[in-house]
From Swiss-Prot:
Annotated NCBIfam families: MDH_euk_gproteo (TIGR01772)
The protein's name: Malate dehydrogenase, mitochondrial
Note: Yeast contains at least 3 malate dehydrogenase isoenzymes: a mitochondrial (MDH1), a cytoplasmic (MDH2) and a peroxisomal (MDH3). Present with 28100 molecules/cell in log phase SD medium.
Phosphothreonine: residues bearing it: 199
Amino acid sequence: MLSRVAKRAFSSTVANPYKVTVLGAGGGIGQPLSLLLKLNHKVTDLRLYDLKGAKGVATDLSHIPTNSVVKGFTPEEPDGLNNALKDTDMVLIPAGVPRKPGMTRDDLFAINASIVRDLAAATAESAPNAAILVISNPVNSTVPIVAQVLKNKGVYNPKKLFGVTTLDSIRAARFISEVENTDPTQERVNVIGGHSGITIIPLISQTNHKLMSDDKRHELIHRIQFGGDEVVKAKNGAGSATLSMAHAGAKFANAVLSGFKGERDVIEPSFVDSPLFKSEGIEFFASPVTLGPDGIEKIHPIGELSSEEEEMLQKCKETLKKNIEKGVNFVASK
């Protein structure tokens, strides 16, 4: 699903050059994500970092005739990570291990938490003003990890920290179009809450399909919430949702850059430091946000919910609060 903003990414003119860094560029998400960013004409300086493979990916992409320069960095060279990050405008973090059959996003926490923490610390040192887009799962916990690291370093800017939840929205659009036999490019489904299982709440009642039968709706909601499992199973242990996630990450990155450029009405969902349920001890929440030159301009209210969605929200908040606390406590304990 390409929004108007996403389509504008492929225009041939560049008004503002942006430096973008991908941390974990050699992985299953990192490689296709880097390709899509190479094709985005808002990006003129693309830096790719990984423990291995980043230089090969960068060389491969450098043959594509777009107006961006691409360079790979590894920890083997002096200041490799620092040079990949220095003065960059945007950092995308898809680094970490992928899900395997039987694993949940939370099962990834033990491995990915330390990876994200260390990359956040490096970003705080070398690119304290950059927008940070967290893709590494579990996003419900890794975003709070990044926030806590930035706070400890004294450079936390809640307007520039994003958990990328776009995949939930594009899945919702695609899946609802299959059920209702509509054009998926014309579907827009607000998905709120978090980015795993029951914390994912697609607001079907706010679409044109509110009269869908209960059975259809329940099946649709479950598929949106657990769509990642569908891919993990289909790949038979060989990976997770890498290609669709790369598309989602590139789509959201383009939206952030469009906001930086001052384009109007750039609205995308994201898991952010949010006031919506702070009074209940929930510091982060996914909802539509308006993006502008300084990052988040406005966090939109979730609107009117059906009774079913209200019930889903209550269950979401219980789980989400624990997920967030898990991330915060991880940083505090180290």
